[in-house]
Amino acid sequence: MENNHHLAKDSLDELNPKRGKGEHETQVSQYTVVEEATIPQSLVKTSRSADHKVMEASKVADTRTAWSTKIPAVLLPVFVINIALFKYLVFANFSTKDRVLFGLGNGGINIFSMWLLLATYETWFRSIKEVIVACGAGIRSFPQKRGVNMLYAILKLTFVNAFAIPLLMFFRSHFEQWRLGCPLVERVIGVMLNVAYFIIEIENPGLFTRVFNKYCDCLFAIRDILNRN
């Protein structure tokens, strides 16, 4: 029996000269180990995470569809307010300091008016205090609860444009020789700032959100002051 076993091993080695003697035994043991291996836990966790993301995406899609009928009615008055204030800011005879303050106020008015309209449109609050409380609480939880990320992006873009307005006014105030070409320069700067905003959001998504939340804290402060009164 032993002679037959050695002859079988020698015949295998002769069929494949590159294989060292006895190497087939090692490969057989390796295959045995592979068969006994279990699925890595990391793959299981990844699969569960993917399933969870699919479920969340479907919920967001359903919510976005439900809100699609409300978006035009809510945004139209906000854009009208924005255009009116912007035109007044451009053509009014303000100093640079006044323009900066008014520009920041313009962004604040847009943010607050959007939330005022959203809150009033949805639940018809009975008092201004309740509207401010709802707006302040909703700003931080809006993307998670509503799922309408487009509105949240527009909200933050309004905040970015509030800083863009004073910069545009700087060109109109200090470069009189550019007055004829100033509208084009203003549009280019506005587009560049909005593109820069999206780049920042992609590269460092938490940076602008932290700044935006600081701005939202002002609304919470207003809410607290009104609640004391």
Swiss-Prot record:
Cellular compartment(s): Endoplasmic reticulum membrane
GO cellular component terms attached to this protein's record: perinuclear endoplasmic reticulum membrane
Transmembrane segments: 71-91, 100-120, 151-171, 188-208
Bias type Basic and acidic residues, positions: 1-26
Membrane topology of the entry: Multi-pass membrane protein
Protein family membership: Belongs to the WTF family.
Its biological purpose: May act in meiotic drive.
Protein name stated in the entry: Wtf element wtf14
Gene label: wtf14
